[in-house]
Amino acid sequence: MRNFILFPMMAVVLLSGCQQNRPTTLSPAVSGQAQLEQLASVAAGARYLKNKCNRSDLPADEAINRAAINVGKKRGWANIDANLLSQRSAQLYQQLQQDSTPEATKCSQFNRQLAPFIDSLRDNK
């Protein structure tokens, strides 16, 4: 049951996290922990795509993490700790592997939800 709930929650984080354009008007600040969680979720999803969904076009984990940090910087999140991001992303990746959602569903959802992030990975190559 826990795993069945984990995937939809990760999907919501991925959808709402780094895929939105930064608004031009002032918005409430996002806590450092929420920033880390959003970026780590995106990195974990990309890593899952690479390792479990046959996306050999995706770069090494370190490059994915750097790209996630760059996304954060573009959003004005300058204080993301690379080591914490790597650790949290690895934890989330392990949770995704243990999630009972069918792999085809996870791959399809992540491919769709992470398309803008994956495009940014290609642009940075």
Curated annotation (Swiss-Prot):
Claim: Repeat is one of the keywords in the record: no
Compartment(s): Cell outer membrane
One record GO biological process: intracellular protein transport
Keyword Membrane in record: yes
Pfam families to which the protein is assigned, alphabetical: T2SS_PulS_OutS
Membrane topology: Lipid-anchor
S-diacylglycerol cysteine: lipidated positions: C18
N-palmitoyl cysteine-type lipidated residues: C18
Any single Gene Ontology cellular-component annotation: cell outer membrane
Keyword terms, alphabetized: Cell outer membrane, Lipoprotein, Membrane, Palmitate, Protein transport, Signal, Transport
Signal peptide: 1-17
UniProt record similarity statement: To E.chrysanthemi OutS.
Protein function: Involved in the secretion of pullulanase.
UniProt protein name: Pullulanase secretion protein PulS
Organism listed in the record: Klebsiella pneumoniae
Lineage: Bacteria, Pseudomonadati, Pseudomonadota, Gammaproteobacteria, Enterobacterales
